[in-house]
Amino acid sequence: DKLMYSSYVSEIISIFGVEDDPSSKEVYDLFYKVLDRIASAKSKKDVMIAVIKFQLKMMLIVGFGLEFDSCLCCREEILNEDMYFSIQMGGVVCEECNKDLGVKLKLHHKMRDFMQAMMQFDFNFESEYDKKATDKVCEVCFNLLNEYIQSHTDKKIKSISVLNA
């Protein structure tokens, strides 16, 4: 698993990383941190948490950061209610606005809180969310974020087929 997730991370960097880009150092630092965390991970959950943090932070660096605080339509803050996640729009939509949009992917507020924490906290900081996360939560988040990442490139992420095998 460690090798395949490392391969996945490398592939994302080769797709979105641009040589001589002002954010190259930030991307390199993130790459180093995620590989270090994957190498020292004691469980699949630890590997996946490192990769989820990478997915969220990498998309933020390259300008495709996700919105988890407010509805992308009405801009109202979404607190402890369920919401919908729009891959096309890059974030959450409240139930009221979704009546018009028809986004199918319902997102529980605890899942949103988990991803928000993964995106906001320092890479090496272990939050309560890291400790409470289950393999299933990590798997759902990884797949959701991978789908979002895939929607921003016309290149196929090849390593994902091995991870899903």
Predicted regions and their residues:
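Non-catalytic alpha-helical scaffolds and adjoining flexible linkers that form interface surfaces
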Residues: D1-A165
